[in-house]
Amino acid sequence: MENPANANPIRVGVIGCADIAWRRALPALEAEPLTEVTAIASRRWDRAKRFTERFGGEPVEGYPALLERDDVDAVYVPLPAVLHAEWIDRALRAGKHVLAEKPLTTDRPQAERLFAVARERGLLLMENFMFLHHPQHRQVADMLDEGVIGEIRSFAASFTIPPKPQGDIRYQADVGGGALLDIGVYPIRAAGLFLGADLEFVGAVLRHERDRDVVVGGNALLTTRQGVTAQLTFGMEHAYTNNYEFRGSTGRLWMNRVFTPPATYQPVVHIERQDHAEQFVLPAHDQFAKSIRAFAQAVLSGEHPREWSEDSLRQASLVDAVRTGARDIYFP
């Protein structure tokens, strides 16, 4: 993809003052030469003002007012998942490119409709799975292609976190909270990244907290048509885990901190073959910065990779299958 180095920066407006925007996305947008934050909207003006005092741009009260601005070319959407479909649609119809936090929507039909709107208007809609832009995964894929563990027999991935405070948005099912949409989408997306487009749902268990009617953990089993399985674990009532592992015909390969590595973290690839073990230390990278750069380059070049939308739609199908096909366990 061409790097439009001499292009004017994309003027970005932010809809929603979420924690992920404050900690990760806005610092990356501010540091990226191809983007300029021109406006930040919140339903509360004082909250928008606090964000702009740190990251620049104009504070805007209310999301519709931001979409009416002429100084906004693209919109970043870090809202709760249940609000994504409405505000992505409104942003696209206002002529803005959109970078939306994962999950893009809460189901595949909504995602299909939004990508259709984007195509009709010649706009980019990108789901921000930032971990996909870290080079460590390409390096792992290259090692696997070289046969470091033989033929891949199975894949396992886990992303679990300890319980959050009682009022945390993850426990609010009415705004798209819950472990599946907030956390489970990561191992599902990793399975698709490495095992390909023919992944199928086999089974799942979702553990619901009865009082709040929210999913707090789960496991899913997927398979390729050749019988390579993906065993996925996710939850928010666990010890912290953040890893994936491949088992092959002659060995295994695994890594930790695969989904949310800090920008200064040097990933370590572990490989075991019979009585032989080795480690490879990979360079540190800022995956948020790389995600922002990929979005900006695609907007400025006009090249909107079709595989991005196709991957997002396959992901949405798998998440839908896990949600609707799972055995639901309620406690206490």
Swiss-Prot record:
This protein's pathway: Antibiotic biosynthesis
Family designation: Belongs to the Gfo/Idh/MocA family.
Keywords: Antibiotic biosynthesis, NADP, Oxidoreductase
Protein name stated in the entry: dTDP-3,4-didehydro-2,6-dideoxy-alpha-D-glucose 3-reductase
Matches recorded under InterPro entries: Gfo/Idh/MocA-like_OxRdtase_N, Gfo/Idh/MocA_domain, GFO_IDH_MocA-like_dom, NAD(P)-bd_dom_sf
Any one biological process term the GO annotation gives: antibiotic biosynthetic process
Assembly information from the UniProt record: Homotetramer; dimer of dimers.
Catalyzed reactions: dTDP-4-dehydro-2,6-dideoxy-alpha-D-glucose + NADP(+) = dTDP-3,4-didehydro-2,6-dideoxy-alpha-D-glucose + NADPH + H(+)
Enzyme Commission designation: 1.1.1.384
Positions with a binding annotation for NADP(+): C17, A18, D19, I20, A21, W22, R23, S42, R43, Y63, L79, H84, R170, D182
Pfam families: GFO_IDH_MocA, GFO_IDH_MocA_C3
Residues at which substrate binds: R24, Y240, T260
GO molecular function: nucleotide binding; oxidoreductase activity
Catalytic site positions: K102 (proton donor)
Chain's role: Involved in the biosynthesis of L-digitoxose, an unusual dideoxysugar attached to various pharmacologically active natural products, including the antitumor antibiotic tetrocarcin A, and the antibiotics kijanimicin and jadomycin B. Also able to reduce dTDP-3-keto-6-deoxy-D-galactose and dTDP-3-keto-6-deoxy-D-glucose to yield dTDP-fucose and dTDP-quinovose, respectively.
